[in-house]
Amino acid sequence: MTMKTRPSEEFIDLLKRSGSSDKMVAIAAQREIAKALELPLRKGVLFGDIVTGIFESMPLEPGAAPEFPLDLLAPGTENEHIAYTNPGHGRIPERHVEGDYVMVNTYGVTSSIDFLLKYAREANWNVLARAMQVLEGSFVKKINDDGWHTLLAAAVDRNILVYDADAAAGQFTKRLISLMRTVMRRNGGGNSVTAPGRMSDLYCSPEAIEDIRNWGIDQLDEISRREVYQSSDEGAPLTRIFGCNLHDIFEIGDGQEYQDYFINDLGGSLQTSDVELVVGVDQVNTDSFVMPVKQQVQVFEDEALHRAQRQGYYGWAEIGFGVLDNRRILAGSF
């Protein structure tokens, strides 16, 4: 439901009835509106945020425990699982392995919104549309924060920080990307065949993306610079370097929310004189970032508001976040 597109006449009539002075009529109409808005809101919450591109959503059956098996190969032992030369007779060596599991706790996420009953009675549908946008935005913000707090905690726990020692403070360089790619491969476990780590995506601030536009001839040749100058914000020259996808998010940057959480709440640190954080993730191996969903978003009408001449809706969901292998995430600074 958008603020600029007029809904159908049936919905307008339903909206008018939801503002009726007859409480029974109003509540019945509000219940229909809540169910009509539930599916669009659910889609917006699941696909309108910046973490579902990283975490794999896993809907669970009612009563199912959010347990996830860990890899049979313990971190750092991949090279020990090798085959043997058989001389032609004799017993083949046995190797016994037993996998462990981790349980990712889920929790409830709730939000609500309400507005004056007269807006519904007068069929002021743009107010309802804006109210639903605010309700959706509250869920999205909460999911973003919880998901990124989990990612940043895993990055701090890994205790590896990559930086370009030759770059000026606050300068985002392609060498930093190259160094992070190398560190991710060398410290990601495995070998050329078994579970190799590779940094596929890098999350940075909008200022870092703008730094690319200001790279000089020591960073880019003239042809590449021209492509950068002419590209849009989503253009490949700005968003893909060395096969690594670049994503700019507002919450990362000097003095921004996620960077402050990384430093002040988690005790992480940047290299001396560096001012911004970047986060690299390996999304080629989909074995680490999980998002169990026990309950999809549900929306209900708030019957108690009719006495105050207001109309409102509330909703809840039950989700969780987990990083099963922190070798799939890497922090850097510039």
Set out the residue ranges of the language-model regions.
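Intrinsically disordered, low-complexity terminal tails
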Residues: 1-35, 333
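Sequence/fold signature of self-assembling virion shell proteins
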Residues: 4-5, 12, 215-334
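Residues forming anionic-ligand binding surfaces in small-molecule and nucleic-acid pockets
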Residues: 106-118
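Structural beta-strand/beta-sheet cores of well-ordered domains, especially the beta-sheet scaffolds
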Residues: 111, 195-200, 309-311
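Alpha-helical scaffold segments that mediate packing/assembly in large oligomeric complexes
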Residues: 115-192, 333
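Short, flexible loop/turn elements at secondary-structure junctions
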Residues: 117, 206-208, 317
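Extended, solvent-exposed, turn-rich assembly/linker loops in the middle of proteins
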Residues: 156-234
